[in-house]
Every structure is written in structure tokens, then in C-alpha cells.
Amino acid sequence: MKKLHHLAAAACVVTLGLGLAACSSSSSSTTTTTTNTAASGSAVAHVACPNGTLTFGVEPYDNASVLIPAYQALSTDLGKALGCKVNLQVAESYVAEILAMKNGKLDMGEFGPAGFVFASQQAGAVPLASFADSNGQLSTYTAGIWVKKGSPVTSLKQLAGHTLALSSTGSTSGDWVPRYALIQAGVQNKVKTEYAGGHPESLEALLHGKVDAAEINSQTEASAEKAGTFNPSQYTEIWKSQPIPNDPITASGTMSPAGQTAIKNALLHLNASAFTSGKTSIASELDFTPPASGQVMIPVTTAMYGQLFALAKALSLTTSNL
């Protein structure tokens, strides 16, 4: 488990690393894969990627070794639709992705709902689309706090005096939402929180008995069940959040309106295979079931994530914390 932090320090995301994960080469600052297309001279490519390349960042909600193949089909199909190269990058941290867009290193990015709050305020990220559920509505997920079955801890208040693994600072379901729940329960200063370094690591901390409780969101739960590494019948979920809107895919605020529109239209018309193909897929990673027919991605607006902006205000988090 990575360095532990007391709950009081969680509000300051400034402590996060500012780099991007490097896997493709020792000198690279990103985990990157490039999709080439033959139609780079199209009018769409001219407005969406005038330099011939579109850089697409993804938040590190799972390991890069999992996310790169999961997002490869989307990157490939998006590149074909736009007629340009798409460089796929998995950020090293939530803040790293925000700063990459702020510093002109990303043209578009998928942010977690909490990350989008800061990306909107700090980097001018413009929401384009998100993932639809089987009914064609914006898909959602939940945060949860789990304990081993038979644990004397059965509620948030009873967490006082116990250890709790959260995922990483800046995570919506792994930090902001459960931390606010502890505040509402009046035990925020009585629980020893440990930032495990990610959603899988938070789950592992509970599985290996390193903590008394752990935040496990519905997406991680589903992925771990599918992989056979988590049996929910042996654990108890003592708290569950209200539904959280799924990640928006955004464009940099410095991109031309025409470019933003071109990318949005391309996303809205991608085939379902872009989200469901492969051993690991976006749909399985984000735990949503796409519509049987129709658009897999639907338009989203900043207003749809208003609850996260309100939560940031309630926790006194601003872009100055970056």
C-alpha cells in the first residue's frame, strides 16, 4: 500500500504527483498508443485535429495495462471517423490529466466526475458525451464501503476507531463521496483513512486484511467479481452512495468550437463494438450495459454534473488545491 494520509489531508489534492505514467518507452511521460488512419486529409480532420494528431487522455481508474486495451477500439474507431491519428494516454494520476490538458498536452480527455469539476475550472474542459445505459440514459455507478462478513462494524458511525481504505485523492467514488459521507456521519476525525493508490488497491487492502473497511465502487466490484477475485457473499456493504453520473469525455477549451463539434458528432455515432469488444472493454470497466440499439454515447452538459460541483464546494475544494 502506498503512503498513508490522514483524512484531514485529503482535501488538498496538491500532494498528488504531476506526471503521466510511462510504459511505452523510458523517455516518455505517458502510457501511449497511436491509432493511424488513411483519411487524414478530410475536412473533419482539418477542424478536429489540424496538426494531424489528436491526443486523448484517460483517468487512471484502473491499471494502464488494463485501460490501454480497453480503450483501443474506441481510439481506433474515433481516428477513422475523424481521419487523423489518435494518441491514447493513461494519466499517472487524476491531477496529472487535468494539468496535461491545462498545459496543452491533451486535446480531449475522459475525466472522473470529480476530476471534471477541476478540469472544467482549471483547464476549461468542455463536456461532449458520456456513456448510455440500456435505456439510453446517462449511466451511473455507486461508491460503497465494505467490511468482512461478521465484522462488528455495521454502519458509518461504527467506523470510528477503525481503518478505512480509500482509493486515491481526487477520486469521485474513492475519495470525495465517501469522505463527505463520513463528515455527514460525524466521524471524519475518528476514522483512520489510508489511501491505497487506486480502486483495485483499495479492494486488495480489504481482501488481505490490511484494513477494517474499504471503499469499493460498483465498477470495481463488478470487474473483480468477473475476474473471480472478489466474492461479495463473504463481505458486507455497510454504506452505498446515491448514483453518480458516469465519466464525461471532454474537449480542451482551447479547441475550436468546430473541432469540439466534430469530435462530439464522431463519438455519438461510434458503433457499440468500440465499447464492448475485447477481453477487457470500456463497458466492462465502467460497468454499464449499452443500449441494444441506438447511440452508446449521449450528449452531456456541465449541468448534469452539478452535484459534484456542489460537493466540491461543501468540502471547500477549489482549483487552488491543485
Kindly label every feature range from the protein language model.
Residues 18-22:
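C-terminal motif of bacterial Sec signal peptides marking the signal peptidase cleavage site
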Residues 24-27:
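Bacterial signal peptide processing site
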Residues 44-57, 62-69, 73, 251, ...:
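An extracytoplasmic/periplasmic, membrane-proximal ligand-sensing/linker region
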Residues 55-79, 91, 114, 138-204, ...:
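Bilobed "Venus flytrap"/periplasmic-binding protein-like clamshell domains
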Residues 58-60, 90-94, 104-123, 130-132, ...:
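Beta->alpha turn/N-cap motifs
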Residues 99-158:
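Acidic, polar ligand-binding/catalytic clefts
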Residues 126-138, 192, 226-243:
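Short beta-strand->loop
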Residues 142-153, 244-258:
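A bilobed periplasmic-binding-protein/Venus flytrap-type ligand-binding module shared by bacterial periplasmic
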